[in-house]
Amino acid sequence: MQLNAHEISDLIKKQIEGFDFTAEARTEGSVVSVSDGIVRIHGLGDVQFGEMIEFSNNTFGMALNLEQDSVGAVILGDYLHILEGDIVKCTNRLVEVPVGEAMLGRVVNPLGKAIDGKGDIDAQGVRPLEVMAPGVIDRKSVDQPIQTGIKAIDAMVPVGRGQRELIIGDRQTGKTAVAIDAIINQRDSGIRCVYVAIGQKDSSVATVVRKLEEYGALANTIIVVAGAAVSPALQYIAPYAGCAMAEYFRDRGEDVLIVYDDLTKQAWAYREVSLLLKRPPGREAYPGDVFYLHSRLLERASRVNADYVEKMTNGKVKGQTGSLTALPIIETQGGDVSAFVPTNVISITDGQIFLETDLFNAGIRPAINVGLSVSRVGGAAQTNIIKKLGGGIRLDLAQYRELVAFAQFSSDLDVETKAQIDRGQRVTELMKQNQYSPLSIAEMATLLFSANSGLLDDIEVNKIVDFEVSLIAYMKVNQVSLMNRINEIGNYNDKISNELQVAIDDFKTNYTW
């Protein structure tokens, strides 16, 4: 069939008449639906993943689902005033948080806005919520310790600067207490701290803030709060916000400690957001990228070399390394560490401190299970004197737990086995520690030396705690020079050993407890 010229011109005219001349808005869109903090938007063709988008009334959201004909976004704040048909605009900026020295001592929400009633924060700048972790070439090995002040951790599960050490256990086993004690111990160390509270009761966070202020650690700490009452979207971004604030100090050649309390609740929030965005669920209804959720966060904790710091500060800081040490917390259900999220985070981190309900209920606090707790890189960073004195302690406790289990089936024990059990009972008592009472290196070394040298063997088990308190008080008053030397140098040698032996013998001979 042939078309003549007249028919062809008619066809072309029809095509031209039916052509839609309206231009597609690439940086603007309109709300199609809004529910449960999730918005479906038509338009926004140029939006990036993770970009901050602006609604009316100065409300912001974050684009998370980029589909062929729509965008799925979460609203970071109140969404009750957002209606179908409202205009949404791109900002060409990823979600950012304020950073800087001005943030220290303040309580903020995940967007960096003050919620402590002390007025606005005049921040030094802003950083994107998510950035790439430092590469292999930018990193330095972990070889400097971070003292938590907790005997059981510093002696047996040491943490180094730049390490990721997981704190894991059931609810009400003292996970937050361990992390808060570690923060309190940094008040005079120059190490900055960030505490991220995710999905917690406001009353619990208020208690933490009050305790940090009481013990003089708040001025050195940023507290990021996404409480149980805020939207899942804010709980999801809270750890990344805290990490961005901490990285500001790391990239200037400083040392930072960050606590994520806890990442289980962040995973729950992310699962909720993902299901509302209609992403396909996987194991335990978590989305497929829940491993990446935590790995990309925890990989940002690192020790960086001087070249990286110089590059990040444009040459202003030279010859200085920086570090970001992470203490993520994971809550288990019924002691099940083989669940989905716990196994993920265990595989990402450089070791774990496992807290046990049975030990906690037995009065052994912190309730650290020495057999299941490990630090994969902290040994290289441990203070010399604690490393040399602490090795024997771990062995004593391990043998004690084994022998106690064996002794249940046998009433007739030889003298050597009974002596080992007696030693283990005393070491177990010695490892107990009250909350909010971190110890210095010298105080810890004194107690570890007394256990290692058999100086506790003639003291009744129920008197060990009284002996410990009195011995520390005696050393602070009568052995000031020795204690200062141990704190400053941190090395262990025959001279230190002899001086400690003489001092403790003198205390046992001339003092009571």
From Swiss-Prot:
Q: Which SUPFAM superfamilies match?
A: C-terminal domain of alpha and beta subunits of F1 ATP synthase (SSF47917), N-terminal domain of alpha and beta subunits of F1 ATP synthase (SSF50615), P-loop containing nucleoside triphosphate hydrolases (SSF52540)
* Ligand binding (ATP): 169-176
Reaction(s) the record says it catalyses = ATP + H2O + 4 H(+)(in) = ADP + phosphate + 5 H(+)(out)
Which is an annotated Pfam family here? ATP-synt_ab_C
Q: Does the keyword DNA-binding apply?
A: no
Q: Where is this site: Required for activity?
A: 373
- Topology relative to the membrane: Peripheral membrane protein
GO cellular component, alphabetical, reads: plasma membrane; proton-transporting ATP synthase complex
Q: Which GO terms describe its molecular function?
A: ADP binding; ATP binding; proton-transporting ATP synthase activity, rotational mechanism
CDD domains of this UniProt entry? ATP-synt_F1_alpha_C, ATP-synt_F1_alpha_N, F1-ATPase_alpha_CD
Q: What class of enzyme is it?
A: translocase
Family assignment from sequence similarity: Belongs to the ATPase alpha/beta chains family.
| SUBUNIT field | F-type ATPases have 2 components, CF(1) - the catalytic core - and CF(0) - the membrane proton channel. CF(1) has five subunits: alpha(3), beta(3), gamma(1), delta(1), epsilon(1). CF(0) has three main subunits: a(1), b(2) and c(9-12). The alpha and beta chains form an alternating ring which encloses part of the gamma chain. CF(1) is attached to CF(0) by a central stalk formed by the gamma and epsilon chains, while a peripheral stalk is formed by the delta and b chains.
What is the name attached to this protein's record?
A: ATP synthase subunit alpha
Name of the gene encoding the protein in the UniProt record: atpA
